[in-house]
Amino acid sequence: MANRGHTQPRALAWALGLTLVWILLGACGGSRPLPALSRRHHRLAADLGTGQLHLAEMDTPEASGPGMVSEHCGKPSPGCESFLGHLQVALHNRFRLLLLGIRQAQPLCSELCDIWFATCESDITCGPTWLPLLEKRGCEPRCTTYEQTFADGADLCRSVLGYALPVAAPGADHCLNISISVLPGSRQERKAQEVTFPRSRRSRTWILDAPGSGSGSGSGSGP
């Protein structure tokens, strides 16, 4: 019991970090300029900066559309937009579970950063860093791609997410990953789920995107 009480503040701090990341993915993950965000998001950002959080501010529709790029830079690729959207939703769901004490804090797997970089390397990004959030700025005037801005996946995650969500070392045992199945159907029909694979000795949590009616479409090896 004492141990559970000791870990609760750390989980809450990590959940606040996830909240910041969730907002960043909606604000700049798709390169939407920060000034275009609603007043609610600016208030939530300020609350995070002072260590206060109003949960009622979280479910605002304005943050659900990553992939909004400045017109002169062109549209984002469907793959990158979809990946960022699922990552945003997954982190938001993770944030709720952390606040409830159902899940413990885990850093991102380095493989997730590599997939993010590979998926979005030709897409436009805001700049080398999206932090600090309270700084009023939009995307840089020139249209730079992920590949031009970041050296690799690790550089991407560290530059973009900073202290808000740490990245585990390659091959680390305890980390959070995301696996997105590119399946037909609208986004509303897809559901992000957290799946832990018990076979592996490594305690990795995978956020698997699959249809709600599916029963585990296999990316695992057969018997």
From Swiss-Prot:
One of its GO terms (molecular function) is riboflavin transmembrane transporter activity. Disulfide bonds join 73-143, 80-120, 113-157, 126-139. It is a peripheral membrane protein. GO terms for cellular component: external side of plasma membrane; extracellular region; interphotoreceptor matrix. It holds the Pfam family Folate_rec. InterPro entries: Folate_rcpt (IPR004269), Folate_rcpt-like (IPR018143). PANTHER family: FOLATE RECEPTOR, RETBINDIN. Riboflavin-binding protein which might have a role in retinal flavin transport. Belongs to the folate receptor family. This is Retbindin. It comes from Canis lupus familiaris.
